[in-house]
Amino acid sequence: MRINGLYTPYWYRDVVDLLERASDRLDQIMIPKVGCAADVYAVDALATAIELAKGRHKPITFEVIIESAAGLTHVEEIAASSPRLVAMSLCAADFAASMGMQTTVIGGTQENYYMQHGENQYWSDPWHWAQAAIVAACRTHGVLPVDGSFGDFSDDTGYLSLIHISEPTRPY
C-alpha cells in the first residue's frame, strides 16, 4: 500500500490507519519520495510502535521509491537503513523533474538525447545511470531492485525494450 510522502501532513495518519486496521493482512508499505535514510527511520519507528501496541505478529515490510536527486545521492544509506526495507525503485518522472531534465516521456528516451556517430543517431538511456546506482545499492544490501514505470502507452517497442533490459542477468 503506497502512503503519502513524508513531505505531506498525511503520511503519519496513513501509517497509523493502515497498521491499526489491517492487522496481518497488510504485507508492505510503499514509501514515496525517499530522500535520505532518516525518511525510512521515521516510518520504521512509527510502524514499530504501532506493531508493538497492537500486537501485530507479522512485521510490515517497506518498498521505497527514489524520486529525487537527494534520494539518488543517498541511495546507499537508504538501502542500508532498515531491515524492513525489501525493495526499491526509481520513479523516472519525478526524478527527472528534480534534476531539471527536459522530459516528455516517463521512463523512455527523449528527443534530442542521443549520441551522434557519423550520420547515425543512437538513443541514449537517460535513466541507466540512476537505475545502475539503485541496483548496486540494492545488491550490496540485499534489497530487491524493482523496475520503475514506463508511461508512454503508445510505444509498444519502447516498453518491450524496457522489459528486455530490465530482466535479471542469468549465469551461463
Q: What is the role of each PLM region?
A:
Residues 29, 78, 91, 134:
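Conserved, mostly hydrophobic/aromatic
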Residues 163-172:
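Single conserved hydrophobic/aromatic residue that forms the stacking wall/gate
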